[in-house]
Curated annotation (Swiss-Prot):
Keywords: Acetylation, Actin capping, Actin-binding, Phosphoprotein. One of its GO terms (cellular component) is cortical cytoskeleton. One of its GO terms (biological process) is barbed-end actin filament capping. SUPFAM superfamilies: Subunits of heterodimeric actin filament capping protein Capz. GO terms for molecular function: actin filament binding. The gene is CAPZA2. PROSITE patterns: F_ACTIN_CAPPING_A_1, F_ACTIN_CAPPING_A_2. Belongs to the F-actin-capping protein alpha subunit family. This is F-actin-capping protein subunit alpha-2. It holds the Pfam family F-actin_cap_A. The modification Phosphoserine is found at residue 9.
Length: 286
């Protein structure tokens, strides 16, 4: 191990550390960071060399953050990245600084939005917030209105997580939806992602995603928002149902074919009792 450590350059060590951090399961960033910190044993090197990994993790995970003085959380995403560590809260029309390591928002300031698309963005946000409140107990959504390649574009992001470290599992749902505002009809493009980590007496991860495409009729802002939510709800319901059914099937067939739930005797072995019997027998023989 010492020989291998001597062969690795600082650049290579940081590259490996960054990979660990970027692939940290949801809700386990701090644990992975602390482990990597111990392995690297160089805080300055880790902070300077792996800073991009901290940022990439938060962007990929749609990390929610609360801004002091404002009621609703906002998501950290690439669509709200203003550069130089600043991000956009489109609902409150503010920019703020975000510390990717501490996951803290500071220095909120007024920020002018894309006025030409703001009425569309607001309509979609209102409809999406109602949908998220109904379907996601811990859900957060952020809706952006941007001009991309000359086209007015709506981007809607949803994040919901459950972190149950005491029960040895953590999970996160993310979905991203886009459509351009064009006459008559437009195409909605979405991607749905689920990541769950279960680590009691083992280490199992579910990482799944699905791409979605559908047509959306564009009329006025409010009606278009309603039709958009119908597409989102149908696709996300179908995806969640498919995931649940698939894993129920695997539990009933594949997993059972791989391993018996009970030994051939149909009785679970109490290893603690066996150990105590063995110790007692050895003491008698002594």
């Amino acid at each position: 191990m010492a020989d291998l450590e001597e062969q690795l350059s600082d650049e290579e060590k940081v590259r490996i550390a960054a990979k660990f951090i970027i692939h940290a399961p949801p809700g386990e960033f701090n644990e992975v960071f602390n482990d990597v910190r111990l392995l690297l044993n160089n805080d300055n090197l880790l902070r300077e060399g792996a800073a991009h990994a901290f940022a990439q993790y938060n962007l990929d995970q749609f990390t929610p953050v609360k801004i002091e003085g404002y009621e609703d959380q906002v998501l950290i995403t690439e669509h709200g990245d203003l550069g130089n560590g600043k991000f956009l809260d489109p609902k409150n029309r503010i920019s703020f600084k975000f510390d990717h390591l501490r996951k803290e928002a500071t220095d909120p300031r007024p920020y002018e939005a894309e006025n030409a698309i703001e009425s569309w963005r607001t309509s979609v946000e209102t409809a999406l917030r109602a949908y998220v409140k109904e379907h996601y107990p811990n859900g957060v959504c952020t809706v952006y209105g941007k001009k991309i390649d000359g086209q007015q574009t709506i981007i809607a992001c949803i994040e919901s997580h459950q972190f149950q470290a005491k029960n040895f599992w953590n999970g996160r749902w993310r979905s991203e939806w886009k459509f351009t505002i064009t006459p008559s009809t437009t195409q909605v493009v979405g991607i749905l992602k689920i990541q769950v980590h279960y680590y009691e007496d083992g280490n199992v991860q579910l990482v799944s995603h699905k791409d979605i495409q559908d047509s959306l009729t564009v009329s006025n802002e409010v009606q278009t928002a309603k039709e958009f939510i119908k597409i989102v709800e149908a696709a996300e319901n179908e995806y969640q149902t498919a995931i649940s059914e698939n894993y129920q099937t695997m539990s009933d067939t594949t997993f059972k074919a791989l391993r018996r739930q009970l030994p051939v005797t149909r009785t679970k072995i109490d290893w603690n009792k066996i150990l105590s019997y063995k110790i007692g027998k050895e003491m008698q023989n002594a």
